[in-house]
Amino acid sequence: MASQDKYYLFLDECGDQNLSSFDPNFPIFTLCGIIVSEQNLGILETQINDLKMRLWKNINIIFHSRDIRKCQNGFENFFDLSVKQDFYKSINEILGQDIYVVICCAILKEPYIRQYGKMNDVYGQSLSFIMERTVFYLDSLKNCNANLTTVIERRGKKEDNALLDYYNRVLDKGTYWVTSDRMKKYFKKFEMKWKKDNIVGLQIADLIAYPVTRYILNPEGVNYAFDVINKNIYQDRGKLYGLKVFPKET
């Protein structure tokens, strides 16, 4: 039996799934995935933990986009601008490396409600797009025999059961473009981790989700964080598969 290459898909979100009541200034839900090989994940983990040790003297700080922006929950040292600048320079160097791939799906709530109503499932829709495009990416790798583990952050028993149901539904039914058998060729394991578990891959997905969302809402705005990770968004033969915006505005 041929040996398998171990890959991970880490998923995090920006915005909420609520279609009944939402901030008109932030009418979007984004599910962001990063795909990384086991070898490259080890590189990223070492670099992130080295940065944590240098600025916090321990590796237990959890990189969370909102806390970083608000300088709270362990990031109060960012009120010292020299520390903040040091962090952003270092994290941009880490995330700017071409050793992982970004695949995101953003749901624009207002046109989505107009077309599909408020009862439809934005998380399941987003996950199906990401899983589909993950298959496209792994198919594109030469001589790849990938064994993929999907990792999602735990929310609570009810929410966790819903996440697992979404995953199994896509795996069992496939999508319009990808059959169930083709999906199951790669998707082998599904894991849920608490934020306190300090999973570097989930933290990277979190750091990427916000700038991607800001870019979709305002593509002409200044967005240095997006500029850093833009080249890592999955493309194939000139087609941008890794940034799905749904539905398309008409």
Predicted regions and their residues:
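Phosphate-ester processing/binding pockets and catalytic centers
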Residues: 1-250
